[in-house]
């Protein structure tokens, strides 16, 4: 599996764009979330050129995770696009309805079903689903709107926009890479997002390959950045940075 980091910030762009990650796995190209990080696809044209289809899996529908859908247009003119997202019973509308509303003609000149040569939208549930022989495990998280952990073949677990929930990591193994949001440098009692101390404490009894901290807070002060650096130096934790690639 190859993992390309396209958008490691939460909320708004800064040093990084917002949530977007590109995976190459078992001859499939998978994108996690559609934040402004989609704009970094220009740096990965060589990756895109190897595939005829892009599969997107959305964790939820907050704008910093879907607004980049409009940036897909120049890259997918000759490709198939399949988008999985949470629909009913977690949300009132389907994935296709939410994204179609975002791309109404008042807001963008190209409708959803014209973003690529062929566009298919599918709703997922916590029953999970498969992409060819790739197993996708879905678990609901705690957030202001329903968000979902995405586990890909137990090699990569994507957990963003969530309070830390250690019970959701029972599938983790020594070969698992974890993409986990890190919004707070210290534990402030935030019930919608995760702090680094709670993440590190909650995962201390789990064996894993690496934790890449993502959905980073653009408002961190220099003091908070130093706190984080001092906590993760010499550990299996690292801060996500746009443009980086991991091969595992």
Task: Identify the residue ranges that each predicted region occupies.
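Cap/insert and terminal regions of metallo-dependent hydrolase folds
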Residues: 164-246
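Short glycine-/small-residue-rich Rossmann-like dinucleotide-binding loops
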Residues: 35-36, 161, 183-184
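Active-site glycine-centered loops adjacent to acidic/histidine catalytic or metal-binding residues
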Residues: 60, 161, 215
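Binuclear metal-dependent hydrolase catalytic cores
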Residues: 1-158, 226-248
């Amino acid at each position: 599996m190859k993992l390309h980091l396209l958008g490691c910030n939460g909320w708004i762009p800064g040093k990084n764009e917002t949530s977007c990650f590109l995976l190459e796995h078992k001859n499939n190209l998978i994108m996690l979330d559609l934040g402004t990080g989609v704009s970094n696809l220009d740096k990965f044209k060589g990756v895109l050129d190897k595939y005829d289809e892009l599969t997107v899996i959305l964790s939820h529908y907050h704008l910093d995770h879907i607004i980049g859908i409009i940036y897909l247009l120049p890259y997918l003119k000759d490709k198939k696009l399949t988008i999985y997202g949470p629909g009913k019973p977690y949300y009132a509308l389907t994935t296709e309805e939410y994204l179609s509303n975002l791309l109404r003609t008042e807001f963008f000149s190209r409708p959803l079903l014209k973003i690529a040569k062929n566009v298919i939208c599918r709703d997922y549930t916590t029953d999970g689903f498969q992409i060819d022989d790739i197993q996708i495990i879905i678990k609901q998280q705690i957030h202001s709107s329903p968000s979902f952990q995405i586990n890909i073949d137990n090699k990569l677990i994507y957990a963003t926009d969530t309070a830390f929930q250690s019970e959701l990591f029972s599938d983790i193994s020594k070969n698992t890479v974890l993409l986990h949001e890190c919004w707070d440098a210290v534990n402030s009692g935030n019930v919608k997002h995760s702090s680094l101390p709670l993440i590190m404490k909650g995962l201390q009894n789990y064996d894993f390959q690496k934790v890449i901290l993502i959905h980073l807070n653009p408002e961190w002060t220099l003091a908070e950045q130093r706190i984080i650096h001092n906590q993760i130096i010499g550990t299996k934790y690292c801060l996500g940075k746009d443009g980086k690639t991991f091969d595992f």
